[in-house]
Each structure stands twice: as C-alpha cells, then as structure tokens.
Amino acid sequence: MSCPIDKRRTLIAFLRRLRDLGQPPRSVTSKASASRAPKEVPLCPLMTDGETRNVTSLPGPTNWPLLGSLLEIFWKGGLKKQHDTLAEYHKKYGQIFRMKLGSFDSVHLGSPSLLEALYRTESAHPQRLEIKPWKAYRDHRNEAYGLMILEGQEWQRVRSAFQKKLMKPVEIMKLDKKINEVLADFLERMDELCDERGRIPDLYSELNKWSFESICLVLYEKRFGLLQKETEEEALTFITAIKTMMSTFGKMMVTPVELHKRLNTKVWQAHTLAWDTIFKSVKPCIDNRLQRYSQQPGADFLCDIYQQDHLSKKELYAAVTELQLAAVETTANSLMWILYNLSRNPQAQRRLLQEVQSVLPDNQTPRAEDLRNMPYLKACLKESMRLTPSVPFTTRTLDKPTVLGEYALPKGTVLTLNTQVLGSSEDNFEDSHKFRPERWLQKEKKINPFAHLPFGIGKRMCIGRRLAELQLHLALCWIIQKYDIVATDNEPVEMLHLGILVPSRELPIAFRPR
C-alpha cells in the first residue's frame, strides 16, 4: 500500500509540472491555416475539392496544459452536465470541434452527414474508444475483455458467437414468454407499491429490478425474487455495484487511470470493488447454467453460445457480464424516460392506448408478433429515445487516416459521436423540444437515419438492441393497458450524466388504474 508521503510527493510533482508548462494556448478557431491532405487519405463524401485542414486546425474550447478544457467543463456544471456543454460547444464551434479533458483528447461530431461519412469508410473491425478503467481492472484481476473493450478479430469472433442469438429477430421473438412472465410480476408489484395518489417511491430502482429479473431469466433461466416482498440481497448488491461502476469510471477517463491505481485513490477502490461484486454475482450464475445444460441444440440461450462457438469460460464471463450490466441499467433507464414523456403528453398516451387496445382487445397478453401491428408504439419509443436518450454520445477510434468535413484526421484519433446533439437539433427535427411520435410515421418527410442513433452506429452497434426493444415494447403494452400515466407537477426535470443520463430528481409521475 502506498504511504501518504508518496502520494503527496506525486501530487506536488504533478502541480509543479503544470506550473512549469506556463500559460494555456489560445482557443483554436476555424480560421487556422489549411493544409492539403496526404494522398493516401480517402476523402469522405463531403469533400469536393480535396482541400483539407489538419487536426490542429480544428476549432474548440481553450486547451490548458494537462487539464485541457476541464476547468471550463467544471465551471459549466461539471461532468454531470457535460452533455449540455457539448451541445453549447456545437452551436459555438460548428459540427466538428476538438476538445481535451485532462488526458482524454477527442474530436466531436454533431451532424448526420459527418456520421454517415464515417459509416461509409468503416473498416471490418471498427474500434471504440479504449475504456482504460475497465481494461485496468481486467488486467488487475486477470479477467478477460468483453465486447465493449475487445478489438480486431478477437472482438469479431466473440461478437459473432453472440449475434447469432441476439441480432436475429426470429431468435429474439422466442423470448417474449419469459419477458411477459417477469412483466406480470412487475405489474403486481406496481399495484402493491403505489400509494393513495398512485406514486411509486424510487421508481427507478423498481425498474432496475424489473430489468434485472428479465435479463437473468433470459440468460440463466433463473429468477431472483426481486419483484417479491422477500428479495435476495445479492441481486440488490449487483444493481448498486453497476451504478457505482458507471459513476466512477468517467472520472478515470479524464485523469490517468494509472495514477489512480498507483495511489490507490478512493475512486479506484470503489471502481474495483464494484467490478469485484459484479463478477462475483455473474460467475456462479453462468457456472450453474452450464452444469444444467440439457445438451439439446437450440434449447438454451447461454449454453448454446458457449458450446457451439468454443468460447473460453473467461471470455463467456466477460461478455455476459457486460451484456447483463448494460441490460439492467440502460433498459430500465429507457423505460423510465418514456413513462415520464407519456405522463407529460396525454394526447400521445391516448393515441397509444387506442392502438394497443385495437390489437389486444380485452387486455390480452401481448406477444412479439403483435408488435408488428403497433407502429405508433414503436414511434413513441423512438421519440423518447430522441428527446431523452439514455446515452448522450458514443465513440470511435480511427484505425486509418480519414477525412471528415474539411479536416484530415490521423489514425488513432478518438471521435465522440454526440447523438443527443443530433436529436435535439432543429436542423434534424422540427420542434425538437416537443414529444411528437407521429414525426416517425410521416411518409412525405423522411427522417435522416443518421440523425437518430440511440444504439450506436455500424458494426459496433449495441448487440442487445433487439432484446432491449422487445422488452420495452412489451412493457409499454402491459403498463398502458392497466394504468393512466399522469404528471404530478409540470416543473422541468434536468438530466444528469452519471455514466448514463438520469433525472435530477424523483420523476413526478403517478399511475392511476384504468
């Protein structure tokens, strides 16, 4: 363990280095001198005359030595409000700008045309941003990498094993009975939890329990009883660990994770303990499921992946862990926000109810095939994900020199794709601040597909997309059939970035039985 004296010496050395670097450079503007792109750099569809500028010419906020733009970010509300700051920067600097946050340097994209250009030049194995805190933990504990941090052919091999089950609609549709089983219990729990005004204390936590039970039944054929009065403490600990991990890794993305590890900071300790808890929960579930495998091809979701695709136990642990934590947090978050949006838009809610009742008379249980006849329900989810996304941005790391807009970007450049900025732009969506699901059903006015990317883009799109959509669509059917979702106040609710976007306060919604 590092002694306090060593920690102080390291900190003093860091501050002296910062002082010695002198004054920060002036903010870069788009008027910087241009340079011609190297011949080997492919021009994207936006280029016409071949004239490009290099990456140092990109506009952006002031870049202080070592700190980058962290001081300005903190002044504007900190990392919790960085999504709002990024939207402000796009208005100020344009569709593409460069920003450095501590040790994290990236180029930000905020237009559909730039994202389309990136997609058209995508390689066979596109790279994501290196999530250094996750890698540091896996190396520290000798665990394998999952799909979020694997790269190259190893990423493709593991992804191929999972996408056979997760990306084929016919395979996902088979899971509706399991999802409905959990939803039936969840609706009963909602009845129990609603107070005399129809409010549910800590609704987000209850939605986490629902999403946890759903993904565990799909993966392990196991229920944890979180929707019952007597719940397993282990499952609650898992959910808490996910939230801790999500809230701590961002801090180590903008400051050197090696420094946190060396100094054994509280952030590193909390992050490591959270991952320990997550793996401790997942491993026994996987082991027990594999031991009970029936040996019948196609009979078991998890075991088929393991047996047919020759993954190692460590690879399975890592991939399933990442899949489960993403499913628990983002699916619950998406359902929470659409319930909020429907509560504030009763006209849209009435139209949704009419559609559901026309397809499912007498409160029938929804099935996957029923969703084909519910375009407005799907439009409601799309609109909610546009207006209040779970994740405000995704990333790429260029694996070759590429030209985007008027800038030649070298290999290794980290790109931040600001998908929330796309969804909130009037250039892409008329009345972008309004919840209007019907915009997705207009035949005469098509929406640019690169203006709405809630699950990412290209080959590294979220592998759990179809499963998440099925869970959310079925959940909406169940809830809208039984409850009128009402707003208990009309005060604005801010979004805070804690790994994903969460409300700044308890959501003011209530559920009144129909």
From Swiss-Prot:
Q: Where is the transit peptide?
A: 1-35
Compartments where found: Mitochondrion
Keyword annotations of the record: Heme, Iron, Lipid metabolism, Metal-binding, Mitochondrion, Monooxygenase, Oxidoreductase, Transit peptide
Q: What mutagenesis or variant effect is reported for residue 416 to F? A: Increases the C23:C24 hydroxylation ratio from 0.01 to 0.12
Q: Does the keyword Iron apply?
A: yes
Q: Which GO terms describe its biological process?
A: cellular response to vitamin D; osteoblast differentiation; response to vitamin D; vitamin D catabolic process; vitamin D metabolic process
- Recorded catalytic activity of this chain's protein: calcitriol + 2 reduced [adrenodoxin] + O2 + 2 H(+) = calcitetrol + 2 oxidized [adrenodoxin] + H2O; calcitetrol + 2 reduced [adrenodoxin] + O2 + 2 H(+) = (1S)-1,25-dihydroxy-24-oxocalciol + 2 oxidized [adrenodoxin] + 2 H2O; (1S)-1,25-dihydroxy-24-oxocalciol + 2 reduced [adrenodoxin] + O2 + 2 H(+) = (1S)-1,23,25-trihydroxy-24-oxocalciol + 2 oxidized [adrenodoxin] + H2O; (1S)-1,23-dihydroxy-24,25,26,27-tetranorcalciol + 2 reduced [adrenodoxin] + O2 + 2 H(+) = (1S)-1-hydroxy-23-oxo-24,25,26,27-tetranorcalciol + 2 oxidized [adrenodoxin] + 2 H2O
A single Gene Ontology CC term: mitochondrion
**What CDD domains has UniProt attached to this entry?**
CYP24A1 (cd20645)
Report the outcome of residue 416 to I: Increases the C23:C24 hydroxylation ratio from 0.01 to 0.19
In its UniProt record, a GO molecular function of this protein is:
25-hydroxycholecalciferol-24-hydroxylase activity
Spell out the activity-pH relationship. Optimum pH is 7.7.
Q: Which cofactor does it need?
A: heme
Documented EC number(s): 1.14.15.16
Positions bound to heme: 462
> What this chain does, per the record?
A cytochrome P450 monooxygenase with a key role in vitamin D catabolism and calcium homeostasis. Via C24-oxidation pathway, catalyzes the inactivation of both the vitamin D precursor calcidiol (25-hydroxyvitamin D(3)) and the active hormone calcitriol (1-alpha,25-dihydroxyvitamin D(3)).
Return the protein name.
1,25-dihydroxyvitamin D(3) 24-hydroxylase, mitochondrial
Organism whose genome encodes this protein: Rattus norvegicus
